[in-house]
Amino acid sequence: MEFKLNFNMDNAAFDFAEGEIVRILRQVEERLNVGRDSATIMDINGNVIGHWEIED
């Protein structure tokens, strides 16, 4: 089993990168807690910037 998380940080949402990374990781945590095994990652501005998933 493998957990993969990848997102692009080349936009204005990452001017304060640490805060945006924490926000994204909390969002991933919330989805894992409700049983999700994958999702698209969006930045604070609504742009699709990546994906995470659990693979067998």
Which residues fall in each region the model found?
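N-terminal acidic leader/helix
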Residues: 1-27
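Short, intrinsically disordered low-complexity segments
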Residues: 33-56
